A protein has these predicted regions:
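Domain-level signal for soluble alpha/beta catalytic cores
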Residues: 3-293
Length: 293
């Protein structure tokens, strides 16, 4: 009988460890107190970035050990290296900058999130995105029963952030048209996927609050600056964005999506049923599976 080599064994293992599992989770966890303290100390200049990373490493190791103990088959870093679920990913691109907010932004049921103001200063490009190294750390913790999952904001989320009512003018100054920006988002995501796939990622999750925002008719208009037919066309644009990135990804990369209505200090960003987006989101988006709230 022919012996199975290591590459073949890895393919067999990956085939049996594809998300979603019967019992699963989204991937973001509440930050431990020691991590919150370390991040605050770093922002105050009391510790170095390397010292912060040491605390992050310890917290991630403890989290993964607990996840395995509970019998889950997917492991993540809990997003412990991020300030937010989505903006840190954007900050990893050239052409995107951020600064500490003064008044807060993104209102969650009456509370303004005190997260960095994020803005575009040039055309986006990517090389050596920091999330790739973040993934490698978790990848090294895989065993025969677990597979590492990487979460990132969806292409639609990236596009929507910079084509919303507040930032669209700046985006058009840089790109000229929304179509040109959309093409660059597709290209940039393709390059990121190429990098993280080469690092061994086979389970990728698109976190997507765009659809969660669009379920609320009034909020949809406020966020996008569009209404009526223009808003319906916008929904088709973000659907096409996600689908194009999925289409161009490697065939054996599992891409799932997580749709929610936002969460900050246990408050919500949006509310409403899926009816207004269901046909597009569930009928035409070509992801492998949905994590829904």
């Amino acid at each position: 009988m022919r012996e199975i080599n290591s590459q073949e064994m890895e393919k067999i293992r990956m085939k049996n460890l594809t998300t979603p599992f019967r019992y699963d989770y989204v991937g973001s966890f509440l930050r431990p107190e020691k991590l919150k303290k370390a991040r605050a100390d770093f922002e105050a200049g009391k510790i170095t970035r390397e010292q912060l990373k040491e605390v992050e490493d310890v917290c991630i190791l403890e989290l993964v050990a607990k996840i395995k103990e509970l019998g889950y088959h997917v492991i993540t870093d809990g997003e412990f290296r991020r300030a937010t679920w989505h903006l840190d990913f954007m900050w990893g691109f050239d052409g995107i900058e951020h600064k500490k907010t003064v008044d807060g932004n993104t209102t969650f049921d009456g509370e303004a999130a005190m997260i960095d103001d994020t803005f575009m200063v040039g055309k986006i490009s990517i090389k050596n995105h920091p999330f790739v190294d973040h993934f490698k750390f978790v990848k090294a913790l895989e065993d025969e029963n677990t597979i590492a999952k990487q979460t990132v904001p969806s292409p639609a989320q990236f596009y929507a952030y910079f084509t919303g009512a507040e930032l669209l003018d700046t985006t058009l100054e840089i790109y000229g048209t929304e179509e040109a920006f959309a093409e660059d988002v597709i290209r940039a995501y393709g390059e990121f996927i190429e990098e993280i796939y080469a690092a061994g990622c086979r389970n990728l999750q698109f976190d997507d609050c765009v659809w969660g925002g669009l379920v609320n008719p009034k909020l949809a208009v406020a966020l996008t600056g569009r209404r009526g037919e223009a808003l319906e066309e916008y929904k088709k644009v973000i659907l096409a964005l996600n689908n194009k990135v999925v289409e161009e990804a490697p065939a054996d990369l599992i891409i799932n999506t997580h749709v929610c209505r936002g969460n900050y200090h246990s408050t919500f960003f949006s509310s409403g049923a899926y009816d207004g987006v269901a046909d597009l989101l569930f009928g035409e988006e070509n992801v492998n599976a949905y994590y829904l709230e």
